[in-house]
Amino acid sequence: MAVNLYDHANQLEQALRESDEYQAIQNAYAKVKENQESKDLFDEFRETQLSFQQKQMQGEEIGEEELQKAQEQAQKIENDSNISELMAAEQNMSQVFQEINQIIVKPLDEIYAD
């Protein structure tokens, strides 16, 4: 009997949406959006992250001034309890993703284990 992996993937998606980790991200992000200062800082930080990623993908160097700005943003973010809570929730979800990924690739790892 053939297994439809996409059905299982869709079930996993639904389970993730119902998880405590996902709910924590939703709740933390709602707090960020409710506080305009937190929201502005978070949006600015995300723009900086995207800019850095684009530059890295294009092989461009990140300038000293840009690094300084990013460090200043990171310091502000550490001092913002709403964003800190969101980032902690994201880290928890990232850990779940890593553990799920290990489970998913286990069959391939077993093939190549010898």
UniProtKB/Swiss-Prot annotation:
SUPFAM superfamilies: YheA/YmcA-like
Pfam families for this protein: Com_YlbF
Family: Belongs to the UPF0342 family.
Name by which UniProt lists this protein: UPF0342 protein SSP0954
